[in-house]
Curated annotation (Swiss-Prot):
Gene field: CYP98A1
Cited CDD domains: CYP98 (cd20656)
Cofactor dependency: heme
Protein's organism: Sorghum bicolor (Sorghum)
Origin organism lineage: Eukaryota, Viridiplantae, Streptophyta, Embryophyta, Tracheophyta
Stored Pfam families: p450
Enzyme class: oxidoreductase
Protein known as: Cytochrome P450 98A1
Length: 512
């Protein structure tokens, strides 16, 4: 590269951001306050790894609605229930679009799925499909045996680990047992296939499935800082071949499974799995192949890690709070007894279990900043100007810990949800683990049912305690960085069987 070209690049790097900053001051109006951005990088160097905590700290300093600059892109973050209502209800339609970076643009085939689609005819059509066909009470009930099967498989796995010779009283990594049920459940619901046998061995398609998921995560995490600075992207071009290969591999596996189901439809008729529903409804809803594949993988990415995260955080709170654990076990013994396993039909008679689920999701929402919204027009939030094209995030982690709304917000106390009937599926803006408005998670009830079932079974079958010598305050309750927030340190706990009948610890397999 000769000297004149180097000089041109250097001048561009300096002058373009200064010019843009001047133009922004003139056209953007009265923006929310926030930390002073650096030239070119914006606030990227100031953002701490665990963003929900970082943004809460900034909200305490600058106010409940703040401006955060990701390079040259503006993101507005709100941190109170009142402002969440402004974003997700009062300005819902104007803020219903999704920002797509170069990676999500390619993964979603320019928003042909649901999660990354802009609000418009395509989104409305696919959302209608989800609400009227895929996540109906009738379909969720029809698929209940799969969920109950996989939860009993989890119980069997924990029991084997806890009672193996030499393991009595030894801690186990709880997440390992949760991941198995989440993987099997979502693949069976979506594809109608169990890729794992009774011994925990994964077949060839299952290994390919896991490889595709892991590759997608690696590719998405490999984006450079140029992703946030549009005028530098020519210096950091995407590896288009990498995305092309990944998508082709994903599509090839998905289409093979769809073809298998098409064959089974002819032989035995339609079932209730999501792939069967999409195949049956493809013509009625005018679904492209890209949309069918995108919807199936939306369900997988949205439902796998979030379930594990939610249950692991709940178990961490329960081993740190023996009073709550004992109270829940007393309710389970009273309603379910000690001679059978819990069923989802028991939920209506288990209010404390429901309160435990709600309190766990209040303190530890698996997606603490939700997915970003994008302004399709100029709007006002909290009296500030939000320009068209800006991203807007709701810090639901901070909203649910607001001391102005919640008494003793950091205390784990499920009783608060017995004292007041608080909805967690989007109608009460004080607690929003599934979002609200046009972008609320369509599978919220499915997620709640699975989390409640897993927690209920783990507490009904076992007493849980911390490893010897570990105090409640010793458990690391910090989150890991990322869009979804696992526990930074995987929970280790000791499981002691509490039901007398050994057969209650066996998996109850269901073929469907």
């Amino acid at each position: 590269m000769d000297a004149s070209l180097l000089l041109s690049v250097a001048l561009a790097v300096v002058l373009i951001p200064l010019s843009l900053a001047l133009l922004n001051r003139l056209r953007l109006g009265r923006l929310p306050p926030g930390p002073r951005p650096w030239p070119v990088l914006g606030n990227l160097r100031q953002i701490k790894p665990i963003r929900c905590r970082c943004f809460q700290e900034w909200a305490e300093r600058y106010g409940p609605v703040i401006s955060v600059w990701f390079g040259s892109g503006l993101t507005v973050v709100v941190s109170t229930s009142e402002l969440a209502k402004e974003v997700l209800k009062e300005n819902d339609q104007q803020l219903a679009d999704r920002p797509r970076n170069r990676s999500t643009q390619r993964f979603s085939r320019n928003g042909q799925d649901l999660i990354w689609a802009d609000y418009g005819p395509h989104y409305i059509k696919v959302r209608k499909l989800c609400n009227l066909e895929l996540f109906t009470p009738k379909r969720l009930e029809a698929l209940r045996p799969i969920r109950e099967d996989e939860v009993t498989a989890m119980v069997e796995s924990v029991y084997r680990a806890a009672t193996a010779p030499g393991n009595e009283g030894k801690p186990m990594v709880v997440r390992n047992h949760l991941s198995m049920v989440a993987f099997n459940n979502i693949t069976r619901l979506a594809f109608g296939k169990r890729f794992m046998n009774a011994n925990g061995d994964i077949d060839e398609q299952g290994r390919e499935f896991k490889t595709i998921v892991n590759n997608g995560i690696k590719i998405g995490a490999s984006l450079s800082v140029a992703e946030f600075i549009w005028y530098l992207r020519w210096l950091c071009p995407l590896n288009e071949e990498l995305y092309k290969t990944h998508n082709e591999r994903r599509d090839r596996l998905t289409m093979k499974i769809i073809e298998e189901h098409a064959k089974s439809l002819k032989e035995s008729g339609a079932k209730q799995h999501f792939v069967d529903a999409l195949f049956t409804l493809k013509q009625q809803y005018d679904l492209s192949e890209d949309t069918v594949i995108g919807l199936l993988w939306d369900m997988i990415t949205a439902g796998m890690d979030t379930t594990v995260i939610s249950v692991e955080w709940a178990m961490a709170e329960l081993v740190r709070n023996p009073r709550v654990q004992k109270k829940l076990q007393e309710e389970l013994d009273r309603v379910v007894g000690r001679d059978r396993v819990m069923l989802e039909t028991d939920f209506q008679n288990l209010p404390y279990l429901q309160a435990v689920v709600k309190e766990s999701l209040r303190l530890h929402p698996p997606t603490p900043l939700m997915l970003p919204h994008k302004a399709s027009t100029n709007v006002k939030i909290g009296g500030y100007d939000i320009p068209k094209g800006a991203n807007v995030m709701v810090n639901v982690w901070a909203v649910a810990r607001d001391p102005k709304v919640w008494s003793n917000p950091l205390e784990y106390r499920p009783e608060r949800f017995l004292e007041e009937n608080i909805d967690i599926k989007g109608s009460d803006f004080r607690v929003l683990p599934f979002g609200a408005g046009r972008r609320v998670c369509p599978g919220a009830q499915l997620g709640i049912n699975l989390v409640a079932s897993m927690i209920g079974h783990l507490l009904h079958h076992f007493e849980w305690s911390l490893p010897e010598g570990t105090r409640p305050e010793d458990v690391n309750m910090m989150e890991s960085p990322g869009l979804v927030t696992f526990m930074g340190t995987p929970l280790q706990a000791v499981a002691k069987p509490r039901l007398e009948k050994e057969e209650l610890y066996n998996r109850v397999p269901v073929e469907m």
